[in-house]
A protein has these predicted regions:
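Acidic/charged, solvent-exposed loop-and-adjacent secondary-structure segments enriched in E/D, K/R, S/T
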Residues: 23
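P-loop NTPase catalytic phosphate-binding loop
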Residues: 4-18, 26-45, 49-53, 62-71, ...
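Short, charged/polar, Gly/Pro-enriched secondary-structure boundary elements
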Residues: 74-82
């Protein structure tokens, strides 16, 4: 394919020298040097022709003055496994801090690790088959797998589907709600926990808890169902947790198949700045989660865009595939640790 692209560019009057080819789990990036720098302005104009001619969704990226790259989708997507020999070193070398999360592999085939402290609340959206639940399990399993014994987190989980988070029911210090009524009760309890922590901080004269203070993680598997079942009554609890949780070590991880305005309200969106967009059904859904189109063009099965707080551009990732046996291993490591 790269030779065909090089030949087509030459026929279009843009001779290039191929610098390198990077094969990532969900795409191939081919980097070129221009023979003549004045041809750079022409390249972007010709990419649409290349895409149509090759029947590929080719993305043009300008980098250095006389250098550019073209990104093509892979013919055969590669899954990134949670426990994978190729990326196993991540748990031994890269995940060195408590709350480090292996979010996936980027377009340069680089494993990307981020800390929950830098993205204290996370909003995940994706349609059926997009990998939404897998990404949610990946985040939970990373937190379990990498937890330090002296400051292991506690959990509040809301699973109105009753089965998605059922494997975590035997975790120590983990409450799971399976009905809307239980969910409201647990979220109200988390808000009391917030007040208690703030009272402790006030009495000690501190504005933010230390990094080694144990965290509480609130996981909502499907916000859409919960908002519908409670007629939006849970919104005030979610917003309060998002507004006050960061300073006192309470984190919120919310997922939904329905990233519409009545589910991801303005107040919720304004207070959860880290977003993970997997494949969604429309540009409208993409705009509600990311602020622009793009997520509707993702391929599903873990293909995602990660928007970090205070960062303008998203990171394109292939998230790890987490199996039931991976979840069991992570739980055992957490309990045994």
């Amino acid at each position: 394919m790269e030779q065909e692209i090089k030949s087509l560019l030459y026929e279009l009057g843009i001779p290039v020298i191929q610098r390198e080819k990077i094969v990532a789990p969900n795409c191939v990036s081919i980097h070129y040097d221009l023979v003549k720098i004045e041809h750079l302005a022409q390249v972007e104009k010709k990419v649409k022709f290349l895409s149509a001619y090759l029947h590929k969704d080719i993305v043009y990226q300008k980098s250095e003055i006389a250098h550019f790259s073209l990104r093509l989708p892979r013919e055969d997507d590669k899954f990134v496994k949670f426990y994978d020999e190729e990326y196993d070193y991540i748990f031994n070398k890269k995940l060195t801090k408590d709350r480090d999360i292996f979010m996936g592999v980027d377009n340069n085939n680089v494993p990307r690790v981020f800390n929950l402290d830098d993205m204290p609340h996370i909003l995940i959206a994706g349609t059926t088959g997009s990998g939404k639940s897998v990404m949610l399990n990946n985040i939970i399993c990373c937190l379990l797998r990498n937890a330090k014994k002296e400051c292991r987190p506690s959990f509040t989980m809301i699973d109105t589907k009753r089965v998605e988070l059922s494997m975590y029911r035997n975790l120590p210090d983990c409450d799971i709600a399976t009905t809307a009524e239980q969910a409201v009760e647990l979220l109200e309890g988390v808000c009391y926990r917030l007040e208690s922590r703030y009272a402790m901080m006030e009495s000690q004269g501190i504005r933010k808890i230390s990094s080694d203070y144990f965290r509480h993680i609130v996981v909502i598997e499907e916000l859409g169902d919960l908002m519908m079942a409670t007629n939006g009554a849970v919104e005030k609890y979610i917003v309060k947790i998002a507004q006050l949780g960061r300073a006192c070590g309470v984190h919120l991880i919310v997922a939904t198949q329905h990233p519409v305005v009545r589910v991801i309200t303005g107040a919720i969106k304004a207070n959860i700045s880290c977003r993970i967009a997997l494949q969604v059904t429309s540009g409208i859904d993409s705009r509600n989660i990311l602020g622009h189109n793009g997520a509707e063009k993702l391929k599903g099965k873990g293909d995602c865009l990660l928007k970090l707080p205070d960062k303008a551009n998203e990171i394109h990732l292939q998230c790890p595939l987490v199996t039931d046996s991976d979840i069991t291993r992570a739980i055992n490591a957490f309990i045994g640790g």
